[in-house]
């Protein structure tokens, strides 16, 4: 199929494979929706610390993948 976009639930990542750290759900929701997701929230005490998790994030937006954060 061409022209079909899919979405996934994931930690949104910066270009260096680092997550966006957070403290408030509202900041993550704003970041996620600005990048085309349905919504987002701050995942507290998760695998990557307190980080933004997005719901239905488009495929063209980077997500945290296996490997180290390259700061």
Swiss-Prot record:
Domain LCN-type CS-alpha/beta: 8-70
One record GO biological process: defense response
Gene3D superfamilies reported in the protein's UniProt record: Knottin, scorpion toxin-like
MF GO annotations: sodium channel inhibitor activity; toxin activity
Tissue: Expressed by the venom gland.
Propeptide boundaries: 71
Function: Alpha toxins bind voltage-independently at site-3 of sodium channels (Nav) and inhibit the inactivation of the activated channels, thereby blocking neuronal transmission.
Protein name (record): Sodium channel neurotoxin MeuNaTxalpha-12
Organism whose genome encodes this protein: Mesobuthus eupeus
Origin organism lineage: Eukaryota, Metazoa, Ecdysozoa, Arthropoda, Chelicerata
């Amino acid at each position: 199929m061409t022209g079909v976009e899919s979405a996934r639930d994931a930690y949104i990542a910066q270009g260096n494979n680092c997550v966006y750290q957070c403290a408030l759900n509202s900041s993550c929701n704003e970041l996620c929706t600005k990048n085309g997701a349905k919504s987002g929230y701050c995942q507290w005490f998760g695998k990557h610390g307190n980080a933004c998790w997005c719901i239905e994030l488009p495929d063209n937006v980077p997500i945290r993948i296996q490997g180290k954060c390259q700061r």
